[in-house]
C-alpha cells in the first residue's frame, strides 16, 4: 500500500496501532479502528491468546504511575493520548524498525489481572490460569514481606517446577536459572546469588512428579498469602492542598487498606475487611469511608484529586466486593474438599504403615506354626469409626486370630494380604474417648460398624466417599469453578448479594446520589438494633470469615425470611440443598439477572455512594 492510497482512504486513516503488553513479558500488536469499544478490543486480545475465561482480566493504561482499568462499555479513544487520535497524515513518521509505520505510534495497553481470587481452581481456563500465574510472578518480584522470606524460596521452587519440569542433575546444575527472575531484589541482595543457586536445586528436587498445572495451583495458593501481592494501589490525599499523595489505598481480595507513604516503604494505618466497611462515599474529589457500626463522626475523609478517579475507584471497589461475596460459598466448598483430601491422605498413609508393621510378625508367626498362607490372606480387618458415640476403645491395628471365609458382609476383606480400607468415617467425635484404629471383631462388630457408618453418613458429605481417580494428574474441569461476568454484574447470583443501584434526588441540592446497598446493618438504624443479639452465639462479631461458615445453616434460615425484599440477599439457590449445605453448581451460570450498565456514565458533579449495610440482615452475616 503506497502513501497516496493510504492518505486518500478514510477508513484506513481511522485505524491505529495498539501494543498489548502481556503478563509474561511478551506483547502483541493490533491494528484497530480508533472508535472501537474496549470490550471489542478485549475480545480480539483473548482470541489471539486463545483465552476463553477473561472475567478476571482487564485492559489498563498507566496514568500517573497507576493502572487505570478501562470500562468495557466505553470507547477506546477516551483512554488514549491526544496525539494518538490525530489523523495519520499529521502524525510524525517513525522508523519502520520500531514496528511503527503510517498508522502512527502505538498506544500502550496492559492486559493484566483486575480481580484476584485466592484459589487457582476458580479459574477454569488453562490459559487464563497460566496468565494469572505469570501476573503473580511479576507481583512477587516487587513484594516486600521481610518476615515471610521463606515463602519466596518455596515460590521459586514451584515456579521452577512449572517452567522447567522435574529436576535433572545432568541439565539443572550451576546457573540454570536467573535468581532475579524468581526472587525480589532485596532477597537476592541479602542472600546473594551463590546462596540461592546452592539451596534452590534441593527445593526444586522436592517438587518431583508435580505437573505444570499442579505447580501453577500451588504457586497461586502460596503467592496470594503474601500481603502485598494480590493488591491494587491507588494514591490518596489528606486534603485538597496536597501536591503529592501522602496516603495509598490498597484494594485487596478481602477489603480495603490505608497506608501512610514513608520514604521507601508504606506503613499500614487501617485495615477494613469487607465485613467491617459500612459505606463508601465519593463526592467529587472527596472519598469517605464509614466503618460499619460506628457513628458518622468516626468516618475517614480523603481526596482522590480528580472526579474521574473517584468514579473509577467506586466501580473497582464495588465489583471487587461483589465478586468476593459471590465466591464465598464456592471457596468454602473448595476448602472442605481440600481438607477432606488431606485427611484421606493422612489416614491412608497411617493405616498402610501400621498394617505393614503388624502383618510382618503375624506372617512370621503363621509360618513358624506351619499354617498355610491362604489362611492369612482371608483374615478380616475391620476398621473402627473415629466418630463412635459410646465406645471407649483405644487405638490400634489388630488382625483376627481365627481364619474365616470371606462373605458378602465383609466389605473390608479381600483376597490380597494388604487389604484396602474404606475411609468413610467422620473426624468429629460425639462423646467417644477413643482414637482411630483397626481392630478385630466378629459378626457383632460388623453390626456395630455398619451402625456407625450409617450415623456418619448423616454428618459427612457422601461425595467425600467417592474414590478420586489416581491416573489423572491434571486438574479436572469438574474441580474448577467457572467465573462468569454475571458474578460481577448481577443483582442476585444463586441468591448471593449483588448491587442495587438507585438514583435518589436531593431536595436540598441539584446533585443526585447513587446508592449501592449490599449486606449488613444500616448505621442509621444502629440505635434501634444495637440490642439485637443472635440466638445461637453472643460473640459472632469477633469471628473470622473462616469461623462464620460454621453458622451457614442459621444464615440460610435468617436470609430466607427477607428473600423477597428489594434489599435482601441470601446464599444458595432455590433448589434442594444436599447434605453438605451448598447450592447446586449448575446455578452458577443460570440463575442470575444481568445489569446492562451497573454504573452509568455521569457528570463529575455526581454524588456517588457505595453502601455495604442493610437493615434486615444481622451484621455477622458474610
Swiss-Prot record:
GO CC annotation, single: cytoskeleton
Kindly state which keywords UniProt assigns to this record, in alphabetical order. Cell membrane, Cytoplasm, Membrane, Phosphoprotein
A Pfam family per the record: FERM_N
**Positions modified as Phosphothreonine?**
523
The record's listing under SMART domains reads: B41, FERM_C
Q: Which residues carry this modification: Phosphoserine?
A: 522, 525, 542, 544
Stretches with biased composition (Low complexity): 384-395, 425-438
Q: Does the keyword Cytoplasm apply?
A: yes
The UniProt record lists the keyword Phosphoprotein = yes
Subcellular location, record wording: Cytoplasm; Cell membrane
SUPFAM superfamilies assigned to the protein according to its UniProt record, in alphabetical order:
PH domain-like, Second domain of FERM, Ubiquitin-like
Q: Give GO terms for biological process.
A: apical constriction; protein localization; regulation of actin filament-based process
Q: Topology versus the membrane, per the UniProt entry?
A: Peripheral membrane protein
The protein's superkingdom reads Eukaryota
The record places domain FERM at: 16-328
Chain positions covered by the region annotation Disordered = 357-452
Which coarse location class applies to the principal site listed for this UniProt protein?
Answer: cytoplasm
- Name the chain's protein: FERM domain-containing protein 6
Q: Which organism is it from?
A: Mus musculus (Mouse)
Q: What is the lineage of its organism?
A: Eukaryota, Metazoa, Chordata, Craniata, Vertebrata
